[in-house]
Each structure stands twice: as structure tokens, then as C-alpha cells.
Regions:
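N-terminal nicking endonuclease/strand-transfer module with a His-rich metal-binding environment
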Residues: 1-199
């Protein structure tokens, strides 16, 4: 664990960036990650049963998930790649704290609203974001930190639909997004508790 990681507060959840150097450089990265998130046929998590909710930010998401992916790829076609690092997708996972996950599991009507707000943060207002909330009930050898905990996968298009420039994702950006997500979760959970609605 790095010194930077030691200073992060995980009490309200943690953000894990899966886009390491050389990862997601394949042209089919976007549909593969989407398939994994949804447990689609042919994916490594085919027929997963722990998907609670999914959607997209910055793309039409009420018709078909394949249409979402087409929209991602259309934006990418407009970007001219100047370097050897041809990253086609960013994949990040926010793992809720155990307590927050329990509250959200007991109040599923809030999951849609919270996950959309979280995707808005991850998008920075210019990067299309597909997301899927998992209950954490299924064992996942690829992401052991998510086992037994509610979590949300973010598939972020690394090309801006506003500027067509690449997303700069590094430790500082991950830390910034993590803090924003933690603050959002704290606010939303506190409001839920104060409303007298949490079960």
C-alpha cells in the first residue's frame, strides 16, 4: 500500500481505479466491460444475479444498452489518437461501506437516484459514464474487495463528448472523485436517516 493510499479515509466507501497502464487498450474494451457489469452472455460473469440497477450519464440509456455503447464508440471515432496509449475505456469501482450498503439494500428506491448522481460526478460533466450497481452477493475473484459489499461499477468513456480530448486519470483524479463520492454518500445517507424512512 502506498503512502498516498494510507492517508485516504475509507469510512464512507472507496474508489478503485482498474485502468492500469496497458489495460483496456483493446478496441472491444467498452462492450466487454459493459457485458461484465451486466453479466451478459459470453462475459466472464455470465448470468450474474447481483445487478440491482444500471444506467448511463451523458448517453441515452432508456432504449437499449447496446445503443449506449454505440454512443460511446461514436464519440471515440471523432478523437484522433496521437499517442501509443490507446485506452478505450476507464473502469472504476466504488465500494460502499458495509453500513451504507445495508441501508441502501433496505431502501432500494434510493439506489437509482444516488447512482445517477455518482455517475454525474464520475463524468466530470463531459465524459459518458455507464454504471451498474451490484449487491455484492456474488463472489468475484477479479475484485475481491467488492465481495460481500454493495458496489457500483463505472465504465467511463475516456474521450470527452464536449472537447474530444482524452480524460486524464491519475491518482489525484481518483482521490478527488473518491472524496466527492464519499461526500455525496454521506449527504444522501444522512438525509435518508433524517427523513425517518430508512428501514
Amino acid at each position: 500500500m502506498s503512502e498516498k493510499s494510507k492517508n485516504r479515509n475509507y469510512e464512507s466507501g472507496m474508489l478503485i481505479n482498474k485502468a492500469k497502464k496497458g489495460k483496456y487498450n483493446n478496441t472491444d474494451a467498452v462492450p466487454k466491460i459493459k457485458g461484465y457489469i451486466l453479466g451478459e452472455k459470453g462475459s466472464s460473469k455470465e448470468n450474474r444475479k447481483d445487478i440491482i440497477h444500471y444506467g448511463a450519464y451523458g448517453a441515452i440509456d432508456f432504449l437499449d444498452t447496446d445503443l449506449i455503447i454505440e454512443q460511446f464508440l461514436d464519440v471515440q471515432k471523432c478523437h484522433v489518437r496521437h499517442c501509443k496509449n490507446k485506452r478505450y475505456a476507464d473502469h472504476e469501482i466504488f465500494v460502499f461501506s458495509e453500513d451504507d450498503g445495508i441501508i441502501l439494500n433496505r431502501n432500494p428506491n434510493y439506489i437509482s437516484s444516488i447512482s445517477e448522481k455518482m455517475a454525474s460526478i464520475m463524468s466530470d460533466g463531459e465524459f459518458q459514464t455507464f454504471y451498474g450497481v451490484h449487491s455484492g452477493d456474488m463472489y468475484d475473484e477479479n475484485y475481491p474487495e467488492t465481495n460481500g459489499k454493495m458496489h457500483i461499477h463505472f465504465l467511463v468513456n475516456p474521450v470527452s463528448f464536449k472537447t474530444l480530448k482524452k480524460r486524464q486519470e491519475n491518482f489525484s483524479a481518483t482521490e478527488k472523485h473518491e472524496l466527492q463520492l464519499q461526500n455525496l454518500i454521506r449527504t444522501e445517507i444522512d438525509e435518508l436517516k433524517n427523513s425517518g424512512e430508512p428501514k
